[in-house]
Amino acid sequence: MTRTSEFKIAIIGAGPAGLTLASLLTASPHPFNFTVFELRQRPHPSEVNLPCGNLDLQEGLGLQAIQACGLYPQFLEIESDCTQQSKVLDKNGKVLFDHVTQGQPEISRNALTQLLLSSVPVDRIRWNTKVLAVTAADHSSGQGTVVSQETTASTSTSETFDLIVGADGAWSRVRAVIPSAPQPVYSGVCYITLYLPRLTEEYHELDQLIGGGTLAICGDGKLLLAQRTVRGTARVCLFLHSKCQPAVQRALQSSGHDDRVGPNSILDANSLLSTLPTRPEDLRELLLTNDDYFASWSDDIKHLLMVTLKEQPADAEIVAHPMHMLPLAPYPHTHMRGIVMVGDAAHLMTPFAGKGVNVAMADSLSLAEQLEYLAVGRSSTMSFQDALDEALVGYEEVAHPRAKKAMKLTWHNLLLSYSDNGAEQIGNVLES
């Protein structure tokens, strides 16, 4: 039988999914031979003190993966500046929901990265390395190929692997190898991320408005999300739906598209992005005085926006980004020998249900479990490549339905958020 140290695994991407898988394989009693490829440089531990987004890890998903990595005691020691309080307001400032949940502890993205990295040997991850090409498994050898190049190198390297795991995010190079796998589509939403420093020191009324955790305000095709992060800073995100533009709204209403099946193909991110200035002063003027944006919203909400934008450096360039997702159908993609995907590569979704990272980490746990079964033993009449393929099919039979459920919930929540009474709808969902 082929030992785990004898078959090679390539993990493309060192995000939450890739690092979770690397941590699980490291914790295994079996000596898995894996290499992680990541374009970024290794994050410095001091980055845990930088403001960033927070994640609520959920039972049976992200938390279960952390426990399986053997990192739960360390996880509990991480103090988050963001509590589990959730507030929902309408555009008039009316509080529709205000509650502190249990069982979904918050952790910053940077802290999660450092936690997972602490459990993976340094030599297992090739930082500053770009994957240039991925080739599917060859029928004769049963191995696929990864072509990579260090950012400081002048030549590339080609290596063969028995298993290639795509953990490489939204525009996955691994996904592109699978002929039937769809590419991301525009969800209809563009987003802007800002940071408000010294919240607790200087802006007491905004401190009270945001609360101890996450504040969501919905109305008129727009969503404002404010969330506490490190060192008294708030992360303020604007999620603007293309239909906040009257012309787009009219086109959507006359298109006859059934939103339940996914985004309308007539939506074009550029029609919204092209209207948004990049200078803080100009963007502030547009958002606070134009009725298509926040001019009619309550004074306290506009004050939050005004202060946040004034706090941006005068020479800052504020760039809005389109938010993409994988289509709800067709899903899942066709199985391919020697290749498997986890996280956004497998099921890119918007953040409207908080499921993306949670399902990504659950993917890695399910895949690691199948590889453990493979390591324990297989039928003596089955070749290693057939046994590996059987393990990958077993993983997909678990992961795909779970991802499909999360994708549907996420899309449903996006539609609710931008419905005529979105704030009330979201409040009702959280109450239930």
From Swiss-Prot:
**InterPro entries this protein is in?**
FAD-bd (IPR002938), FAD/NAD-bd_sf (IPR036188)
- Primary residence: membrane
Ordered alphabetically, the record's keywords are: FAD, Flavoprotein, Glycoprotein, Membrane, Monooxygenase, Oxidoreductase, Transmembrane, Transmembrane helix
Q: Which GO terms describe its molecular function?
A: FAD binding; monooxygenase activity
Q: Which residues are glycosylated?
A: 33
Superkingdom of origin? Eukaryota
Instruction: Report the membrane topology from the UniProt record.
Output: Single-pass membrane protein
Which cofactors are named for this entry?
FAD
Q: Where is it located?
A: Membrane
What pathway does the annotation place this protein in?
Secondary metabolite biosynthesis; Alkaloid biosynthesis; Mycotoxin biosynthesis
EC number per UniProt:
1.-.-.-
Instruction: List all membrane-crossing ranges.
Output: 7-29
Q: Name one GO cellular component term.
A: membrane
Q: What does this protein do?
A: Monooxygenase; part of the gene cluster that mediates the biosynthesis of penigequinolones, potent insecticidal alkaloids that contain a highly modified 10-carbon prenyl group. The first stage is catalyzed by the nonribosomal peptide synthetase penN that condenses anthranilic acid and O-methyl-L-tyrosine to produce 4'-methoxycyclopeptin. 4'-methoxycyclopeptin is then converted to 4'-methoxydehydrocyclopeptin by the ketoglutarate-dependent dioxygenase penM through dehydrogenation to form a double bond between C-alpha and C-beta of the O-methyltyrosine side chain.
Q: Which family does it belong to?
A: Belongs to the aromatic-ring hydroxylase family.
Q: What is this protein called?
A: Monooxygenase penA
Identify the species of origin: Penicillium thymicola
